């Protein structure tokens, strides 16, 4: 039996009477032909009732009351008999039948009920895992994935608790990724997809083609991502070099290429952006321009605006200034335009690659920082000594 302390109570009548009333209510719909009494065993009785729940949103004004009533009965089913009941419930209370956005929609109602069921099965890991998967899919339909605790740390903790096999982990990560994308959370979706690819090794990397392609696609189109070299180190992505050379070339382009490289690539592969990356080319043009600016900033911290306009294929007017402002706002670079000198002064920038050279540079900067802090500490100590000597 599930932990009923985790669920609200929806009916104050005995189970048999409640089951009969549910059957009587559901039989109001012409397509439902339930026996008025049903099997004596609660589990079998509920399986029959749950098999009709796919039609409930079509006619009932009391979807929430009916689902809550049924869920209060499901949790009293003994543990060894509850799995078929839960299977029937989540099969028929799914995004295929429960639609809408937000808590007030049919999908939102289903999210609330599934959440209660999920909490009630904390001691039954197999059942709880199934409910969680259904909950993620329903959250995607209702655009409520932000309300579900599904960050990577939490997911890994759950996988350990449930002892989820690798393929099961991948299935859940794919579902979370889809839900995040639907809810316009591309940066989080990219992290989830990277974690998914991390489950592959060199032994099975060749089987990860679809996941690897989706990982690259999600990362490239994410407006907040500017560094992609970490993807190159994943076995599943490395395998794209032979299984899908075009996608791998696109990844390399966004790792280190420029606007000119991108334009040449698109000229050779005109349908790649729409067919493979499935994104408006305007978005990618802005992305590659930002990346090109970051590359220029790595080479020098003072860039002539005329040169910048040429490299970015943007008119050297207010349009260029607006682009630079956007670049600063998304933290691609930090700096300011010197209108008198007609230059862009770059004070800092994001690295497109973070390899050994960048680690060496970081080490040098940290050493300088530590030395400065020591000098400041010594100066303060000397001042204190002088004050005490007065």
Curated annotation (Swiss-Prot):
Its main location: cytoplasm. One of its GO terms (cellular component) is eukaryotic translation initiation factor 3 complex. Residues 188-351 form the PCI domain. One of its GO terms (biological process) is protein deneddylation. The keyword Disulfide bond does not apply. Keywords: Cytoplasm, Developmental protein, Differentiation, Initiation factor, Oogenesis, Protein biosynthesis, Signalosome. GO terms for molecular function: translation initiation factor activity. It is found in: Cytoplasm. The keyword Cytoplasm applies. Component of the eukaryotic translation initiation factor 3 (eIF-3) complex. Within the eIF-3 complex, interacts directly with eif-3.F. Component of the CSN complex, composed of csn-1, csn-2, csn-3, csn-4, csn-5, csn-6 and csn-7. Within the CSN complex, interacts directly with csn-1 and csn-4. Belongs to the eIF-3 subunit M family. PANTHER family: COP9 SIGNALOSOME COMPLEX SUBUNIT 7/DENDRITIC CELL PROTEIN GA17, EUKARYOTIC TRANSLATION INITIATION FACTOR 3 SUBUNIT M. Component of the eukaryotic translation initiation factor 3 (eIF-3) complex, which is involved in protein synthesis of a specialized repertoire of mRNAs and, together with other initiation factors, stimulates binding of mRNA and methionyl-tRNAi to the 40S ribosome. The eIF-3 complex specifically targets and initiates translation of a subset of mRNAs involved in cell proliferation. Component of the COP9 signalosome complex (CSN), a complex involved in various cellular and developmental processes. This is COP9/Signalosome and eIF3 complex-shared subunit 1. The gene is cif-1.
């Amino acid at each position: 039996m599930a932990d009923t302390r985790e669920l609200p109570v929806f009916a104050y009548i005995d189970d048999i009477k409640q089951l009969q009333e549910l059957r009587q209510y559901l039989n109001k719909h012409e397509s439902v032909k339930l026996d008025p009494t049903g099997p004596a065993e609660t589990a079998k009785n509920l399986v029959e009732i749950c098999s009709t729940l796919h039609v409930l949103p079509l006619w009932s004004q009391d979807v929430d009351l009916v689902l809550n009533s049924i869920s209060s009965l499901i949790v009293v089913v003994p543990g060894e008999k509850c799995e078929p009941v839960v299977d029937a419930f989540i099969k028929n209370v799914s995004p295929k039948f429960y639609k809408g956005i937000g808590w007030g929609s049919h999908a939102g109602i289903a999210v609330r009920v599934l959440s209660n069921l999920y909490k009630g099965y904390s001691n039954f890991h197999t059942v709880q895992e199934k409910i969680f998967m259904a909950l993620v899919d329903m959250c995607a339909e209702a655009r409520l994935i932000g309300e579900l605790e599904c960050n990577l740390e939490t997911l890994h903790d759950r996988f350990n608790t449930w002892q989820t096999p690798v393929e099961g982990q991948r299935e859940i990560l794919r579902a979370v990724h889809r839900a995040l994308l639907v809810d316009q959370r591309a940066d989080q979706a990219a992290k989830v997809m990277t974690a998914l690819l991390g489950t592959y090794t060199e032994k099975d990397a060749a089987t990860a083609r679809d996941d690897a392609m989706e990982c690259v696609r999600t990362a490239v189109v994410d407006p907040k991502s500017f560094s992609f070299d970490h993807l190159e180190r994943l076995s599943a992505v490395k395998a794209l070099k032979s299984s899908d050379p075009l996608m791998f070339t696109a990844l390399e382009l966004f790792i280190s290429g420029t606007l000119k490289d991108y334009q040449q690539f698109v000229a050779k592969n005109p349908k790649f952006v729409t067919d493979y990356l499935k994104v408006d080319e305007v978005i990618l043009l802005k992305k590659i321009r930002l990346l090109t600016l970051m590359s220029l900033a790595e080479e020098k911290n003072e860039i002539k605006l005329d040169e910048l306009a040429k490299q970015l294929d943007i008119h050297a007017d207010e349009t260029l200034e607006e682009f630079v402002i956007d670049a600063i706002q998304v933290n691609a670079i930090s700096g300011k335009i010197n209108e008198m000198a007609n230059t862009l002064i770059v004070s800092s920038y994001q690295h497109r690659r973070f390899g050994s050279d960048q680690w060496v540079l970081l080490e040098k900067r940290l050493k300088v920082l530590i030395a400065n802090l020591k000098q400041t500490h010594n100066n303060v100590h000397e001042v204190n000594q002088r004050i005490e000597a007065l």
